[in-house]
């Protein structure tokens, strides 16, 4: 079973924690992680792009000149896709890009991402994370004590407004509850900071 050091908010070690091997100790499946990231980013696309086809563009109903005898190439409409100001051929229309993955695949992707962070020693487990008031400077002190870099994801067992508001104005820092964890944020963060309670809840959800 993988083990990680548990630290307090001052960055001092206070013990060790054995992690569930099924959640934090598997061989990361890069293909599944890629699928999950592509699926998440695709679902965020608005897909509102639209072009005018030949039947939608204004004008062009009359033949511009007679078929024969002018010496020019034959033309049936001034809105042909070949013409300047003409319609678009096979252009994009509004559509949904999102696709859903099976629940097992989504969970495997999360377990793979968490395991990869453990392998890279980029998982920090906090004994507890509690602030008296929602102040950015208080969160900055904690992050500095933990030696967290520019991009980090803070995961708590449940939504905590003081934590969320304290980290909101810090560039590169995101906060989430266990239920809101997603593959993109996990992989896009240099460090994952999880409370001990969040680790326990994650193991319950993904086990």
Swiss-Prot record:
Record InterPro entries: Ribosomal_uL4, Ribosomal_uL4-like, Ribosomal_uL4_dom_sf
Give the protein's biological function. One of the primary rRNA binding proteins, this protein initially binds near the 5'-end of the 23S rRNA. It is important during the early stages of 50S assembly. It makes multiple contacts with different domains of the 23S rRNA in the assembled 50S subunit and ribosome.
Q: Which GO terms describe its molecular function?
A: rRNA binding; structural constituent of ribosome
What keywords tag this UniProt record?
Ribonucleoprotein, Ribosomal protein, RNA-binding, rRNA-binding
Organism equals Desulfitobacterium hafniense (strain DSM 10664 / DCB-2)
**Taxonomic classification:** Bacteria, Bacillati, Bacillota, Clostridia, Eubacteriales
Q: Which residue intervals make up region (Disordered)?
A: 56-76
The family note in this entry says: Belongs to the universal ribosomal protein uL4 family.
According to UniProt, the name of this protein is Large ribosomal subunit protein uL4
Q: Per the database entry, which stretches of residues form a coiled coil?
A: none
State whether keyword rRNA-binding applies: yes
Q: Where is the composition biased (Basic residues)?
A: 60-71
Which positions form S-S bridges? none
Gene designation per UniProt: rplD
User: What is said about its interaction partners and assembly?
Assistant: Part of the 50S ribosomal subunit.
Q: Which Pfam families match?
A: Ribosomal_L4 (PF00573)
Return one Gene Ontology term, BP aspect: translation
Which PANTHER family does the record cross-reference, listed alphabetically?
Answer: 50S RIBOSOMAL PROTEIN L4, LARGE RIBOSOMAL SUBUNIT PROTEIN UL4M
The lineage's top-level taxon is: Bacteria
Q: Which GO terms describe its cellular component?
A: ribonucleoprotein complex; ribosome
């Amino acid at each position: 079973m993988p083990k990680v050091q548990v630290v307090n908010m001052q960055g001092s070690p206070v013990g060790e924690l054995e992690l569930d091997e099924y959640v934090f100790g598997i061989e990361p499946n890069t293909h599944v992680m890629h699928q999950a990231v592509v699926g998440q980013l695709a679902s965020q696309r608005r897909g509102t792009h639209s072009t005018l086809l030949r039947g939608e563009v204004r004008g062009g109903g009359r033949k511009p000149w007679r078929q024969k005898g002018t010496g020019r190439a034959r033309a049936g409409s001034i809105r042909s896709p070949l013409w300047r100001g003409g319609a678009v051929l096979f252009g994009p229309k509004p559509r949904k890009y999102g696709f859903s993955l099976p629940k097992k695949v989504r969970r495997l992707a999360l377990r793979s991402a968490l395991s990869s962070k453990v392998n890279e020693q980029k998982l920090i487990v906090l004994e507890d994370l509690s602030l008296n008031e929602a102040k950015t400077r208080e969160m900055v002190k904690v992050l500095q004590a933990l030696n967290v870099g520019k991009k980090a994801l803070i995961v708590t067992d449940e939504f905590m407004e003081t934590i969320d508001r304290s980290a909101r104005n810090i560039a590169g820092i995101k906060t989430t509850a266990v239920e809101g964890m997603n593959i993109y944020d996990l992989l896009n963060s240099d460090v994952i900071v999880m409370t001990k309670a969040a680790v326990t809840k994650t193991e319950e959800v993904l086990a």
